[in-house]
Amino acid sequence: MEFTPALQPARLIQRYKRFLADVVTPQGETLTLHCPNTGAMTGCATPGDTVWYSTSSVATRKYPHTWELTQTRDGALICVNTLRANTVVKEALQAQRLPALAGYESLKSEVKYGAERSRIDFMLQASDKVNCYIEVKSVTLSEQDSGYFPDAVTARGQKHLRELMSVVEQGDRAVLLFAVLHSAITQVAPARHIDERYAELLSEAQRKGVEVLAWKASLSASEITLTSPLPVRL
């Protein structure tokens, strides 16, 4: 996906109330950005880091600027806007750039499914294949070049794993796709030290036939694109 116009830089002062962040631009102007990330954002919101923000053309928005990327002091780029994960995955699926998920005829988004009343991020369909259900998770937590999910205990994420296991049991295909939105990450693992139950369910899901994939994005102030697969260590 392209950022049009390109993102603008600023220096982070603080993130607060989960949804807001104050920054100062290179010209010395203080702005309040909308923060589209309700997670812990560990390592992504250190005061003094460079942030990159977009600006909406909608004049009625109370906070027209949105925090998109963080550039850490060691140079790593991180996409903190969790909505971008589904956007870049959808583009990759439509362009048939993910070999394990290519060859389908149609792509649907936000399809209702499951006993726990979930919505799957994407469903792929083809006349000669079983339906393929894809749940996307954004990975931004990095520790020693490893990416971890989740960054906080997630009952919702646990529910999604149970639903994916049910998909396999009914004879369809289920995929958990980690979209890695941190330039320093070289492999992905469940954050057992944060949410042990999620890690246990993920291992169980893989044993029962849920496919677990990770793809890393190339990040810049002008574009985000999924470019390369990464190993997943369970």
Curated annotation (Swiss-Prot):
CDD domains (alphabetical): SfsA-like_bacterial
InterPro entries: SfsA (IPR005224), SfsA_C (IPR040452), SfsA_N (IPR041465)
Gene3D superfamilies: 2.40.50.580, 3.40.1350.60
GO MF annotation, one: DNA binding
Family named by the database record: Belongs to the SfsA family.
HAMAP family on file: SfsA
Name this protein carries in UniProt: Sugar fermentation stimulation protein homolog
Species for this entry: Cronobacter sakazakii (strain ATCC BAA-894) (Enterobacter sakazakii)
Gene: sfsA
